[in-house]
C-alpha cells in the first residue's frame, strides 16, 4: 500500500522548492499583496506568489453579484446575474506562468447540468481561447484546453462526477510541466499528460463562468478562487470548509490526505539541518524497507529548508498501529542523493476520516452545509491592489469615428449587396435668392489676367481699405542707343508691334527665407535709382499698338522649400485654368532710361536718342500671353537669423520710378497668426457696386456626406505627376503648425461620363477656418475732392497772439463748454521759406500736380521699331538679412455704404484711417488750466520694441512735418461728439507717432478669439471713394499731458505770423456769440498731428482708383445661408495615430446602421472551438467578375447546383468522353422512316436514366429454361370439365376383386356405359407410367402466386427486331433497374443531314465538374447598387459553395456551347444537335403504318420519371452483348474563355500614399498698366508698412493678439 503513496509523498516533498520562483516572481505578485493564505494556516511563507481572482475580477465591487453571509467562513458569492470578465492585462499584467495551480471552492446549481460552459477562460486579442477550463455537464467532466506551440489546441479531460452532486466542493487544478492534475476535495481525481503550450500573453480577457454557446454568464456559488504560481501548493491547500470533521488545526493537509498512513512531517530546524520524514504504514513492514524509503525521501527533503522555518522534534512521534511490531527502528539518514526526475502523480489516496466538529457549528439537515456561528470581526485588511476594471456597462451611444486602423490582410470577398433603389429624379428648381456672403474661402491659385474692365461708375460710400498690390515691377529693358535728336513734334500715332524678342535667361536662384518671415507676402524689390528727369512734354502720346507675343522664357529656378504662397493675390482677371503655383521673388525695378530730347517735327531722319518718358499714355491692349517657362530649381537656404538680428530694420529707400509691371511673384506663406479681438459690428450698408472678380478660392472642406449618388464608371488612371526636387527645409522649427498639405497635382483627364442619375445634393460643407489677419495695406490713393456745397466766404479773423507755454498744472475738472469765439481775420501770406534739409530715408509723399503745360504739336507716327535685344536675365530679388522689406497684405473690400449726400447717424468707431491732410488752422484757443500729472508711460511696451531711436526718428520724422493742405469744403456744423477715450500716456513725439499709428492696426488685428483658427484671406475690395469732409465736432476735454518726447525733426519754416507782444495766458472766457463766417484764410503753418476724429459721414463717390494692396482680413461675418454643394475637397493629410483609449462602457443598442464597406480583414486568428453549424443564409446576388486571380488548387467537387434556365440551342458538340448509359426515354410516336443519318459524334456521357416504359411486345423468344418449382398457389375454383384426355397408361394390376355375377351376353362386343360405380377404396400408388403425349392446352387458370426465383438460365440468342407495335398505354413507372454493363461503341456512321434547330430543351442536371477554363476578359462595370441593408454575418462557406456551383454550371453550359462551335472533321461537320425536350402530348392520332426501322438515334436526355407502368410479363433474359470497340477518350482541354461576366465586388483598397508635390506653375503675365494715381498724403503707416509685424511688435508672453 505504501508504494501507491510514494509518488504522492515524493511530490509533497517537492512543494518547498521554488526553483521557478525566480522566473514567476516578475509575473506573480506576493501573497501578502494579494491577501492569499492557505486554508489551514493564517499566512503563507513570504515568497509564495499568486493571484486573488476575487479581488482582481472585482467580484466584491460588482453590485450584480449577490453576497451571502456565511458564519464561520468567507462570503458566498452568487454569480450568474452579470458576466464576470476583466481585461487580461489587469488580471495578469505580465501573463500567467507556465506552471500554476487554480483553486476554487464552488457549488454547482441544478440548471447548469445541461450546459457546456467555461468555468475559467483567458482569451487572446482576437477572442480565441488561450487557456480554458470547460465544464461538460452531460459527460460530468472537466476539459482543460490551451493553445499549443504549433497553433493547434492541446487538451486533457478529467472525469469529475462528484462535482455535480449539488454540494460544496473544492476544485484544484495544477499544471506542472507537461502534466495536469485535478484534485476534488483534497483528493486527487486524475492526472493527464498535456502537450507543449504557448506562453499565455496579457492580451484579451479573463472570464469566469461563461456559457460556451450563448456567451451568457452561468449561475453558480463561489467562495474562493485564486491562482498559485507554484503548482505544488495544491498539496498544502486544506479542505476544512468542505470536510469540517477531518481538519484539526494543527495538522497539515498532507497529514489529512494520508490519515490511514499516519504521515508525520519533520520540518527542518532553524539551524538548517534537514531531517527525514517518517512513514507509519498500515501493515508492519521490515525495517529495511522503511530505511530505504526514508533514505530516498530524505534526498528530497532539503528543498523544504527554503520555506519552512518552524522547528520540530528531532525524532518521529510513535506510530499508533496496534498490530505493529515494536522492533521497527529508524535508520540513520543516508547521504544526500542527487535531484531526481519529477515523478508522475501518485494514485488517489484513501478518503480521510471525518474531522472533529467545530465548537460553534451546527448542521441543520443532513444534506445542508455546516452552519457556524459568526466569529469576532477581524481587523481591517490592508488596502487591496488595484482591482481590475468592472464589467462592461450597457451599450453606450455610438462613439465618434475612430482613427483609421492599419490595413489588414485581404479578407474573403463579402456578400454582394442588394440592388439599390433607383435614384430620385430631381427637377432643377428656380434659382434662389443670393445668400448672405459665406465665409471667405482660402486663396485660390491665380488665374491668367483678364483684359482690363471698363471703369465703373463711382460708388457711394466710405472708402474701402486699400486693395491688393499689382505685381512687382519687372526688369526694365536696356538703355537704347542714342540717336540724333529729332525735332519736337506732336505725339505720333502708335507704331507697329516690334519683332518678338529672344528668350530671356532664367532668373537667379532665390534663397529660402529664414524662420520668422514666413507670414509675409512676397518681398518688394529694392528701390531702383531715380531716373533723370525728362523734359516737360506738353501732351500725352497715343496708346501704343499691342505687342507681339514674346518668346517662351527660360526656366525659372524653383524654391520648393518655400511653401506655396497662399496669401498672394494677383491681378484678378477671368478665371483661367488652375496652374500649379509658381515661386519666385519679385524682381528689382530696372534702371530708368536716359531721357531723350523731344525734337520738333522734321523730316524722317535717323533715329534720335530715346526721349525722356512723357506722361503715360492710355493703357494699350494686353499682349499675347507668352509660352510657359520651365520650372525653377531648388534654392539654397538663407543662413539663420540670430535673435539679435531682429533689431536690424531696413528702411525703404527712396522711391524709384515706377517700373513696368512685372509678373506676379509668390511670397512665402505666413505663420498662422492669432486671431485679433472682434471689433464692434457696424451697421449694414447699402450694397456697393460689384467689385472685380476675386481669384478663385481653394476648395473648401468637404461637405457633410450627401446621400450616395449612383457611382459612375471608374475613369482612366491619371498620368503620374512629376516629382519635385525638395529644397532644404526651412531653418528653425515651426511651432504650432500642422504639416502643410502638398501642392495640388495637375488636373487629371476627364473621366468617362458616369452612368445613372445624379444623387441628391449633399449637405453644405463646414465653414472654412478663418485665415490670419493680413498686415495693413499700403495707403490708397486719395479720392477726388468732395462735392459739397461751398459755404460763404468767411470774414478774416484777427490773428491770435501765441501764448507762452505754461507749466503743466494739475488737471482741473472739465469746465463748462465755452461759446465759440469769433472768426479771426486771415493773416498775411508769408514768404516762402528756404528749402529744408532732406528728409529721412522714408520717401516723402508725392508733391501736388504741377500746372498743366501747353499742348505740344502732334508728332508723326513713328516707324516700326527694330527688334529688341535679348533681355537681361531676370532678377529674383532675394533680400539680404538687413534689407527685409515687406509689403502689406491685401485688404478686405469695404462694406459700408452711406446714403447719398445726407450724413448718416454716427456709426461705431471704425478702423482708424490714416491722418488726413491738415485742415484749415483754427483760432488760437485760450490756454487751458494745468492738467493733473500723467500716469506712467508705456515704457514696457516701447522698451521691448527692438527699434532704435534713430530709426524712430527717421521713421516718424516726415509724419510730423505737415504739408500743404488741400482746401477743405465747409459743411454744416456737427453736433458735439461724445467724450473721447482718455489718451494713452504720453510718450515722446516719435513714439507717440509710432503708437498712434500702429496700435489701431494691432488692435484691429485682434479678434475675440485670440486662440481661434486663422480665417481665409478675403478677396480684394475696390478702393472706395473718399468720404465727405466730416462735421467738425466740438472741442473735447483736454487730454492728460504726456511726458515730453525727444525733439522732432526740424520742420520747414512756417509763414511769418503777425508780430504780437506775448501776452500772459488769460483765463478761459465766456463763450462768445457765434461770429459771421469769415473769408477763407490762407493756409496756416502745419500743426501737430491731431487725435483721430470721429468717423465722418460717407463721402461722395470717388473715381475708381488703382487696385490697392491686399488689406487685412475683415471681421468674421454672420454665417451665410448654406451654399450649393461644393466639390469634394482634396483629402487632408493623415493625422498621427492616436493612442488606444480606455475601454468604454457598453452603450445602448443603436439604430440599424447603413451597411458599411467591407473593412480591412484582420490577421487570421487561431482556430476557435468548433461552433454550431449555422443555418444557411440566402444566396446573395450575382457578384461582379473580379480581376484574374492566380489559379488555385483544384477544389473538391461541390454539391450539384440547381438546374439552370434553358439555354439557347447550341451547335453540335465535339467528340466528348464516353457518357454514362442514359435512362431509356419515353417512347415517341412512330415517325416516318428517316433517311439513315451518319453516325454522330458520341455525346457527353449521361447519367443513368430511370427505367423506361415497357417497350413494344417482341417476338416470342425461345423457351427459357424451366424455372424452379414455385410455391403451391392458392386453391382455385374448380375449372370447367376439360376434354377427355388421352388414355393413360395401364396401371398396375390390382388385386382381384370378388367375382361378379355374370351378366347377360351383349349384342355387340362393347356394351353401353354403365352407371358410375361407387368410389372404391384408395388403392396403392401404381408405378409411374410412360409419359403420354401432351394434351391440348387448357384455358388459362387464375394467376397463381409468384413462385420462387429460378436459377439464372443460360443467355438466349439475340432475336430479330420485330415490327414496332402500336403505342401502348403508358405503364406505371418501374423500379429503378441496376445499371447494365457498358456496351461496345458502335461503328461511326456516315454524316447525316443537318437537322433544323430543335426547341430549347429543359434544363438538364448539372454535369460532372470539368477542368476550370481560362479566365474570360473582365466585363465592363455595371451600375452600382444602392447600399444594401445591414445583413447578417456573412457565411463565407455558403458564398464559396454558391459561387462554385454557379461557376461549374456556367462552365458546363459554355463548354458545351464552345465545343459545339469548334472545327470538326468533314465527316462530323453535320452532327445532329442535342435532342430537344419532349413536346406536349398531341391529340392521339390514328395508328400509323409501321415504318421501316430507322437507325438507332442518339441517347436522349434524361426524361422525367414516368408513372409506374403496368407490370409486364417477365421477359427472357437477353444474351450478353459484345464488348464495345471504342477507346475511352481523354479529358478534354479546358474550354475557351467564358463570356464577359458581370462585374465583381472588389474590396475597397487601402488609401494610397499622398501624391508628390506638383511642379510649380509659371507666374502669370503682367497685368495692364493702371492709370497713374494722384499725389498721396503723408501716412504714418507707410513708415511701418514695410516692416514685418514681428519687428514692430515683438512677442511678449503676457500679451495676447498680435503682441503675443
Swiss-Prot record:
State the residue spans of region: Nonhelical region 9 (NC9).
Answer: 507-521
**Listed GO cellular component terms?**
basement membrane; collagen type IX trimer; collagen type XVI trimer; collagen-containing extracellular matrix; endoplasmic reticulum lumen; extracellular region; extracellular space
| Residue segments, region Triple-helical region 9 (COL9) with 3 imperfections | 375-506
Looking at the record, which segments are called Triple-helical region 5 (COL5) with 3 imperfections? 739-876
The segment annotated Disordered runs over 301-509, 604-917, 1001-1429, 1468-1517
- Locate the region Triple-helical region 8 (COL8) with 1 imperfection: 522-555
Please state the span of the N-terminal signal peptide per the UniProt entry.
1-21
Region span, Nonhelical region 1 (NC1): 1579-1604
Ranges of Basic and acidic residues compositional bias?
Answer: 301-311, 398-407, 674-684, 864-873, 1217-1226
The protein's name is: Collagen alpha-1(XVI) chain
Amino acid at each position: 500500500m505504501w508504494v501507491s503513496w510514494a509518488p504522492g509523498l515524493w511530490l509533497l516533498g517537492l512543494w518547498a522548492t521554488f526553483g521557478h520562483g525566480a522566473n514567476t516572481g516578475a509575473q506573480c505578485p506576493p501573497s501578502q499583496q494579494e491577501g492569499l493564505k492557505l486554508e489551514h494556516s493564517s499566512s503563507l511563507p513570504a515568497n509564495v506568489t499568486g493571484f486573488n481572482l476575487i479581488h482582481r475580477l472585482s467580484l466584491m465591487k460588482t453590485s450584480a453579484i449577490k453576497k451571502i453571509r456565511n458564519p464561520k467562513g468567507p462570503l458566498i458569492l452568487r454569480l450568474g446575474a452579470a458576466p464576470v470578465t476583466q481585461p487580461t492585462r489587469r488580471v495578469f499584467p505580465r501573463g500567467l506562468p507556465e506552471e500554476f495551480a487554480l483553486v476554487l471552492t464552488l457549488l454547482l446549481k441544478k440548471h447548469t447540468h445541461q450546459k457546456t460552459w467555461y468555468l475559467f477562460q483567458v482569451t487572446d486579442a482576437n477572442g480565441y481561447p488561450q487557456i480554458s477550463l470547460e465544464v461538460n455537464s452531460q459527460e460530468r467532466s472537466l476539459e482543460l484546453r490551451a493553445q499549443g506551440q504549433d497553433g493547434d489546441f492541446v487538451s486533457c479531460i478529467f472525469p469529475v462526477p462528484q462535482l455535480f452532486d449539488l454540494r460544496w466542493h473544492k476544485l484544484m487544478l495544477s499544471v506542472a510541466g507537461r502534466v495536469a492534475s485535478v484534485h476534488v476535495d483534497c483528493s486527487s481525481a486524475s492526472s493527464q499528460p498535456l502537450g507543449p503550450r504557448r506562453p499565455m500573453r496579457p492580451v484579451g480577457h479573463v472570464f469566469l463562468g461563461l456559457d460556451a454557446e450563448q456567451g451568457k454568464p452561468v449561475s453558480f456559488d463561489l467562495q474562493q478562487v485564486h491562482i498559485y504560481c507554484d503548482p505544488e501548493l495544491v498539496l498544502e491547500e486544506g479542505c476544512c470548509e468542505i470536510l469540517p470533521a477531518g481538519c484539526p488545526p494543527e495538522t497539515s493537509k498532507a497529514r489529512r490526505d494520508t490519515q490511514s498512513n499516519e504521515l508525520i512531517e519533520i520540518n527542518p530546524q532553524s539551524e538548517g539541518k534537514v531531517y527525514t520524514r517518517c512513514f507509519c504504514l498500515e501493515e508492519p513492514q521490515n525495517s529495511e524497507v522503511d530505511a530505504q524509503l526514508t533514505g530516498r525521501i530524505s534526498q528530497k527533503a532539503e528543498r523544504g529548508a527554503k520555506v519552512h522555518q518552524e522547528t520540530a522534534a528531532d525524532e518521529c512521534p510513535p506510530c499508533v498501529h496496534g498490530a505493529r511490531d515494536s522492533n521497527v527502528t529508524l535508520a540513520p539518514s543516508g547521504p544526500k542523493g542527487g535531484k531526481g526526475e519529477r515523478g508522475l502523480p501518485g494514485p488517489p489516496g484513501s478518503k480521510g476520516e471525518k474531522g472533529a466538529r467545530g465548537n460553534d457549528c451546527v448542521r441543520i439537515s443532513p444534506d445542508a452545509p455546516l452552519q457556524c456561528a459568526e466569529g469576532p470581526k477581524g481587523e481591517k485588511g490592508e488596502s487591496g491592489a488595484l482591482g481590475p476594471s468592472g464589467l462592461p456597462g450597457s451599450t453606450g451611444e455610438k462613439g465618434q469615428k475612430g482613427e483609421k486602423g492599419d490595413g489588414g490582410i485581404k479578407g474573403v470577398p463579402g456578400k454582394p449587396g442588394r440592388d439599390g433603389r433607383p435614384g430620385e429624379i430631381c427637377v432643377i428648381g428656380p434659382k434662389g435668392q443670393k445668400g448672405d456672403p459665406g465665409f471667405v474661402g482660402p486663396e485660390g491659385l491665380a488665374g491668367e489676367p483678364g483684359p482690363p474692365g471698363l471703369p465703373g461708375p463711382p460708388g457711394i460710400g466710405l472708402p474701402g481699405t486699400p486693395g491688393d498690390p499689382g505685381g512687382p515691377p519687372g526688369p526694365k529693358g536696356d538703355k537704347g542707343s542714342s540717336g540724333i535728336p529729332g525735332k519736337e513734334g506732336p505725339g505720333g500715332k502708335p507704331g507697329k508691334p516690334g519683332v518678338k524678342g529672344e528668350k530671356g535667361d532664367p532668373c537667379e536662384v532665390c534663397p529660402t527665407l529664414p524662420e520668422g518671415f514666413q507670414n509675409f507676402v512676397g518681398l518688394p524689390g529694392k528701390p531702383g535709382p531715380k531716373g533723370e528727369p525728362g523734359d516737360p512734354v506738353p501732351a500725352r502720346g497715343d496708346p501704343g499698338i499691342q505687342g507681339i507675343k514674346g518668346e517662351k522664357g527660360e526656366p525659372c529656378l524653383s524654391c520648393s522649400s518655400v511653401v506655396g504662397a497662399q496669401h498672394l493675390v494677383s491681378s484678378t482677371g477671368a478665371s483661367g485654368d488652375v496652374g500649379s503655383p509658381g515661386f519666385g521673388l519679385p524682381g528689382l525695378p530696372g534702371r530708368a532710361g536716359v531721357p531723350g530730347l523731344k525734337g520738333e517735327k522734321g523730316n524722317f531722319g535717323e533715329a534720335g536718342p530715346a526721349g525722356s518718358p512723357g506722361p503715360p499714355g492710355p493703357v494699350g491692349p494686353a499682349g499675347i500671353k507668352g509660352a510657359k517657362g520651365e520650372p525653377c530649381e531648388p534654392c539654397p537656404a538663407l543662413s539663420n537669423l540670430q535673435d539679435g538680428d531682429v533689431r536690424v530694420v531696413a528702411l525703404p529707400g527712396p522711391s524709384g520710378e515706377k517700373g513696368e509691371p512685372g509678373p506676379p511673384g509668390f511670397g512665402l506663406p505666413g505663420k498662422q497668426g492669432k486671431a485679433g479681438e472682434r471689433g464692434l459690428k457696424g451697421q449694414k450698408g447699402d450694397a456697393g457696386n460689384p467689385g472685380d472678380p476675386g481669384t478663385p478660392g481653394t476648395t473648401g472642406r468637404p461637405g457633410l456626406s450627401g446621400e450616395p449618388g449612383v457611382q459612375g464608371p471608374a475613369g482612366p488612371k491619371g498620368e503620374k505627376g512629376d516629382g519635385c526636387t525638395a529644397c532644404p527645409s526651412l531653418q528653425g522649427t515651426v511651432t504650432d503648425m500642422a504639416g502643410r498639405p502638398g501642392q495640388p497635382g495637375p488636373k487629371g483627364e476627364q473621366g468617362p461620363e458616369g452612368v445613372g442619375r445624379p444623387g441628391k445634393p449633399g449637405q453644405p460643407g463646414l465653414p472654412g477656418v478663418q485665415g490670419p489677419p493680413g498686415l495693413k495695406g499700403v495707403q490708397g490713393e486719395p479720392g477726388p475732392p468732395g462735392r459739397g456745397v461751398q459755404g460763404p466766404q468767411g470774414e478774416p479773423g484777427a490773428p491770435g497772439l501765441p501764448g507762452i507755454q505754461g507749466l503743466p498744472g494739475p488737471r482741473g475738472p472739465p469746465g463748462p463748454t465755452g461759446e465759440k469765439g469769433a472768426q479771426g481775420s486771415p493773416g498775411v501770406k508769408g514768404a516762402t521759406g528756404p528749402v529744408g534739409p532732406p528728409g529721412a530715408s522714408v520717401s516723402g509723399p508725392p508733391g501736388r500736380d504741377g500746372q498743366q503745360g501747353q499742348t505740344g504739336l502732334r508728332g508723326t507716327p513713328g516707324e516700326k521699331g527694330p527688334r529688341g535685344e535679348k533681355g537681361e536675365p531676370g532678377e529674383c530679388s532675394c533680400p539680404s538679412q538687413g534689407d527685409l522689406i515687406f509689403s502689406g497684405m491685401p485688404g478686405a473690400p469695404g462694406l459700408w455704404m452711406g446714403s447719398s449726400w445726407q450724413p448718416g447717424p454716427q456709426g461705431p468707431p471704425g478702423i482708424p484711417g490714416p491722418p488726413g491732410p491738415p485742415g484749415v488752422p483754427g483760432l488760437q484757443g485760450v490756454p487751458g488750466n494745468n492738467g493733473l500729472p500723467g500716469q506712467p508711460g508705456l515704457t514696457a511696451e516701447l522698451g521691448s520694441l527692438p527699434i532704435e531711436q534713430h530709426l524712430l526718428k527717421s521713421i516718424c520724422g516726415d509724419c510730423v512735418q505737415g504739408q500743404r493742405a488741400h482746401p477743405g469744403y465747409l459743411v454744416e456744423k456737427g453736433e458735439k461728439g461724445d467724450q473721447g477715450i482718455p489718451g494713452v500716456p504720453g510718450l515722446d513725439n516719435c513714439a507717440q507717432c509710432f503708437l498712434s499709428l500702429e496700435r489701431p492696426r494691432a488692435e484691429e488685428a485682434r479678434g475675440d478669439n485670440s486662440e481661434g483658427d486663422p480665417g481665409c484671406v478675403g478677396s480684394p475690395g475696390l478702393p472706395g471713394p473718399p468720404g465727405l469732409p466730416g462735421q467738425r465736432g466740438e472741442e473735447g476735454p483736454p487730454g492728460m499731458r504726456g511726458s515730453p518726447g525727444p525733439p522732432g525733426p526740424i520742420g520747414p519754416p512756417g509763414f511769418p505770423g503777425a508780430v504780437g507782444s506775448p501776452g500772459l495766458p488769460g483765463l478761459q472766457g465766456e463763450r462768445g456769440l457765434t461770429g459771421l463766417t469769415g473769408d477763407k484764410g490762407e493756409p496756416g503753418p502745419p500743426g501737430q498731428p491731431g487725435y483721430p476724429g470721429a468717423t465722418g459721414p460717407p463721402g461722395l463717390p470717388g473715381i475708381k482708383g488703382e487696385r490697392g494692396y491686399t488689406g487685412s482680413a475683415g471681421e468674421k461675418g454672420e454665417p451665410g445661408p448654406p451654399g450649393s454643394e461644393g466639390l469634394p475637397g482634396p483629402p487632408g493629410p493623415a493625422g498621427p495615430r492616436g493612442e488606444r483609449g480606455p475601454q468604454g462602457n457598453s452603450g445602448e443598442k443603436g439604430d440599424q446602421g447603413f451597411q458599411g464597406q467591407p473593412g480591412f480583414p484582420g490577421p487570421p486568428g487561431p482556430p476557435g472551438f468548433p461552433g454550431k453549424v449555422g443555418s444557411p443564409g440566402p444566396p446573395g446576388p450575382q457578384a461582379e467578375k473580379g480581376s484574374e486571380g492566380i489559379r488555385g488548387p483544384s477544389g473538391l467537387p461541390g454539391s450539384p447546383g440547381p438546374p439552370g434556365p434553358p439555354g439557347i440551342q447550341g451547335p453540335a458538340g465535339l467528340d466528348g468522353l464516353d457518357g454514362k448509359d442514359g435512362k431509356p426515354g419515353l417512347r415517341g410516336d412512330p415517325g416516318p422512316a428517316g433517311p439513315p443519318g451518319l453516325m454522330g459524334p458520341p455525346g457527353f456521357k449521361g447519367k443513368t436514366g430511370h427505367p423506361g416504359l415497357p417497350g413494344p411486345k417482341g417476338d416470342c423468344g425461345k423457351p427459357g429454361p424451366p424455372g424452379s418449382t414455385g410455391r403451391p398457389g392458392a386453391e382455385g375454383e374448380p375449372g370447367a370439365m376439360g376434354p377427355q384426355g388421352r388414355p393413360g397408361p395401364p396401371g398396375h394390376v390390382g388385386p382381384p376383386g370378388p367375382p361378379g355375377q355374370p351378366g347377360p351376353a351383349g349384342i355387340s362386343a362393347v356394351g353401353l356405359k354403365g352407371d358410375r360405380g361407387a368410389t372404391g377404396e384408395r388403392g396403392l400408388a401404381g408405378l409411374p407410367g410412360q409419359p403420354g403425349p401432351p394434351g391440348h392446352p387448357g384455358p388459362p387458370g387464375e394467376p397463381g402466386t409468384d413462385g420462387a426465383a429460378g436459377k439464372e438460365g443460360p443467355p438466349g440468342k439475340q432475336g430479330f427486331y420485330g415490327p414496332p407495335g402500336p403505342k401502348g398505354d403508358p405503364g406505371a413507372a418501374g423500379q429503378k433497374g441496376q445499371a447494365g454493363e457498358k456496351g461496345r461503341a458502335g461503328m461511326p456512321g456516315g454524316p447525316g443531314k443537318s437537322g433544323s434547330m430543335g426547341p430549347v430543351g429543359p434544363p438538364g442536371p448539372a454535369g460532372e465538374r470539368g477542368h476550370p477554363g481560362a479566365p474570360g476578359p473582365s466585363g465592363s462595370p455595371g451600375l452600382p447598387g444602392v447600399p444594401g441593408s445591414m445583413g447578417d454575418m456573412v457565411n463565407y462557406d455558403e458564398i464559396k459553395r454558391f459561387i462554385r456551383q454557379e461557376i461549374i454550371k456556367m462552365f458546363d453550359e459554355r463548354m458545351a456551347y464552345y465545343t459545339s462551335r469548334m472545327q470538326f472533321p468533314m465527316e462530323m461537320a453535320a452532327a445532329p444537335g442535342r435532342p430537344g425536350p419532349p413536346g406536349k402530348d398531341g391529340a392521339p392520332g390514328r395508328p400509323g403504318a409501321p415504318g421501316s426501322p430507322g437507325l438507332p438515334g442518339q441517347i436522349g436526355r434524361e426524361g422525367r420519371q414516368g408513372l409506374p407502368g403496368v407490370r409486364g410479363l417477365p421477359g427472357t433474359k437477353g444474351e450478353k452483348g459484345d464488348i464495345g470497340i471504342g477507346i475511352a477518350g481523354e479529358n478534354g482541354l479546358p474550354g475557351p474563355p467564358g463570356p464577359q461576366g458581370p462585374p465583381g465586388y472588389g474590396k475597397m483598397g487601402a488609401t494610397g500614399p499622398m501624391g508628390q508635390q506638383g511642379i510649380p506653375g509659371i507666374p502669370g503675365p503682367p497685368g495692364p498698366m493702371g492709370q497713374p494715381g494722384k499725389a498721396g498724403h503723408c501716412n504714418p503707416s507707410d513708415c511701418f508698412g514695410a516692416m514685418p509685424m514681428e519687428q514692430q511688435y515683438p512677442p511678449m508672453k503676457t500679451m495676447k493678439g498680435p503682441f503675443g
